[in-house]
């Protein structure tokens, strides 16, 4: 559905240079074309009063299609009672009839010129912005690279600072844990000390009389000690007395031993161990 301009009202005062236009759009019910047209408010009066203006208007109307003419005629018939009603309500319209007619004609000419020029195309050189965009992109990436480099430098500086702090703390810790003594004592490098010579004890140790008295004597110890004493006595007697007296004592001692051996039960029964001889025989053989 197309739209048509039903009414154009322009109020122009003598003191004000700018004009105000009131446009009331109305949709035509019967037309199906998409063309837009302008209808003058007072077309009939302008034709009767201004002859040259009417001629120009006829020329403009000649350029229009027959469909648009029929549409204008229908619209003018429908708008006639509206204009008749508005005229007595607005008495100022009578004073500015000429100005309104001139404006309406100028507007119609402008619309026709626009419609005529709509099909024309003027050649113009294309404007390429790729170079400008490339420059902007280059600047953007350059700034981004500088920002990344600054961040990388700051990160490296922070890492170096942390490393220095750790090394300083480690040195201080080692200094606190340092021992005053040498790590290896001197005796590790010195020769071992000389071992003292062990004195060999004599084979027969002298016995003190106190130990002998305090120790309990067994039967064998008593016999051995008594025999030793007797031997020592006999040796001393031999040196003092003559040989005859010593032989007599020895004979007496031997006789006592033989008598004791004969009195034993084994000798009496005659059952002795093999290899043993009676005491008398041994004494006789000696």
UniProtKB/Swiss-Prot annotation:
Q: Where is this region: Disordered?
A: 31-101, 186-286
Q: Per its UniProt entry, which superkingdom is the organism in?
A: Eukaryota
Locate the coiled-coil region(s) and give their ranges: 131-182
Q: Tell whether Phosphoprotein is among the UniProt keywords.
A: yes
Q: Name one GO molecular function term.
A: microtubule binding
Checking InterPro entries in the record gives: TPX2_C, WVD2/WDL1-4
| Disulfide bond positions | none
Q: Which UniProt keywords apply?
A: Coiled coil, Cytoplasm, Cytoskeleton, Microtubule, Phosphoprotein
Q: Does the keyword Coiled coil apply?
A: yes
Q: Give the record's GO biological process terms.
A: circumnutation; microtubule cytoskeleton organization; root morphogenesis
Basic and acidic residues composition-biased segments: 38-47
Enumerate composition-biased segments (Polar residues).
234-247
Kindly list the places in or outside the cell where this protein is found, as annotated in its UniProt entry: Cytoplasm, Cytoskeleton
Cellular component terms (Gene Ontology)? cytoplasm; microtubule
Phosphothreonine modified-residue sites:
32
What is one Pfam family matched by this protein? TPX2
PANTHER family named in the record:
PROTEIN WVD2-LIKE 1, PROTEIN WVD2-LIKE 3
Q: Which family does it belong to?
A: Belongs to the TPX2 family.
Function of the protein = Microtubule-associated protein (MAP) that regulates the orientation of interphase cortical microtubules. Modulates both rotational polarity and anisotropic cell expansion during organ growth. Promotes clockwise root and etiolated hypocotyls coiling, clockwise leaf curling, but left-handed petiole twisting.
Task: Provide the protein name.
Answer: Protein WVD2-like 1
- Source organism of the structure: Arabidopsis thaliana
């Amino acid at each position: 559905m197309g739209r048509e301009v039903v009414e154009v009202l322009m109020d122009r005062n003598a003191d004000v240079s700018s004009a105000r236009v009131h446009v009331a759009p109305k949709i035509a019910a019967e037309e199906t074309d998409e063309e837009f047209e302008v209808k003058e408010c007072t077309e009939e009066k302008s034709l009767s009063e201004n002859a040259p203006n009417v001629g120009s208007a006829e020329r403009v109307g000649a350029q229009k299609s027959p469909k648009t003419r029929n549409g204008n005629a229908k619209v003018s018939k429908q708008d006639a009672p509206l204009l008749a009603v508005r005229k007595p309500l607005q008495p100022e319209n009578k004073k500015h009839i000429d100005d309104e007619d001139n404006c309406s004609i100028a507007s119609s000419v402008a619309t026709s010129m626009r419609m005529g020029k709509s099909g024309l195309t003027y050649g113009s050189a294309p404007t390429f912005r790729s170079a400008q965009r490339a420059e902007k992109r280059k600047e953007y990436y350059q700034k981004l690279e500088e920002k990344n480099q600054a961040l990388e430098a700051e990160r490296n500086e922070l890492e170096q600072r942390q490393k220095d702090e750790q090394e300083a703390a480690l040195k201080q810790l080692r200094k606190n844990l340092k021992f005053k003594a040498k790590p290896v004592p001197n005796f590790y490098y010195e020769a071992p000390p000389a071992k003292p010579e062990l004195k060999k004890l004599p084979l027969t140790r002298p016995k003190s009389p106190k130990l002998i008295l305090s120790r309990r004597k067994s039967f064998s110890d008593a016999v051995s000690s008594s025999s030793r004493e007797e031997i020592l006595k006999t040796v001393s007697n031999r040196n003092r007395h003559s040989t005859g007296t010593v032989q007599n004592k020895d004979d007496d001692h031997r006789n006592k031993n033989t008598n004791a051996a004969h009195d034993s039960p084994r000798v009496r029964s005659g059952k002795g161990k093999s290899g043993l001889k009676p005491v008398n025989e041994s004494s006789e053989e000696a």
